[in-house]
Amino acid sequence: ESGQIKTTADLDKAIDRAARADLDRRWLVADVTTWYPVTEEPQRHFTNAVAAYARKDYKAAATEIRKATSYLRLEAGRATGAPKQDLDRSVAQLDMLAASMETGAVTDEHTLANAFANADHALAVAHRAKATESWARKDYDKAGYELKAAAFGLESAADWTGGEAKAGASATVAEARAVGEKLASGGAWTRDEVTKGLDALGHSIDELGRKIGRAT
C-alpha cells in the first residue's frame, strides 16, 4: 500500500519530514527483524543531540531530540498500562526539552542526560514488560528480542546516569542480552535461566528507576 512504512530507513525519512500525525498507522511491524533495529535509534539521536549541543548548534540538537521522541511515540503505541504511561511522560518531557533547546534555554548537559536517562529507562520498562508477555505466550523468539531491547534500554539509561549506576547494571545487562540472544536465535536455554534473567533485569530496572527518581 502506498505511503506505508516498512523499513527503518523509511521511518527515519518520515521522521525527517516531521510526518508524525499518522506515523503509527503507516509503520508496519512485519516481523521482529524489521522492528528490532529500531530499538537503538533513540539512543543514536540522543547521542547526536549531545554532540550538537556541545558545538552550540541548538537547532540541530532540538531536531535530534524530536527524532528520538518520534521513536518513543511508536513504542508508546505498542505499550499498555504503566509502561505506556511512563513512555508518555518521557515524550512530554522530551517535547519540552526540544522546545527549550531551540530557544537556547538549556544551560547544561545534565539536563539532557537526565531526560535521556528517563526516556531510556521508560523504554527498558516497556520492553521488559513485552518480554514477559511474549514469554508467557511461549513466543520465544519475540521474548528474546524484547529482552535484548530491554537490556539495551537499561544499559543506555545507566550510561546517562553514570557512576555506580553504570557499573551496577553491567552484569545484569550482559546476562539478559545473552539469554535474549539464545531465545531469539533458537539456541539452547532453560526455563530457569530465562526466568532468572527476566527477574534480574526487572530488579535492575527498578533499582535504576529509584536512583533517577523514576517510578516503576
At which residue positions do the language-model features occur?
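Long, charged/polar, soluble alpha-helical segments
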Residues: 1-216
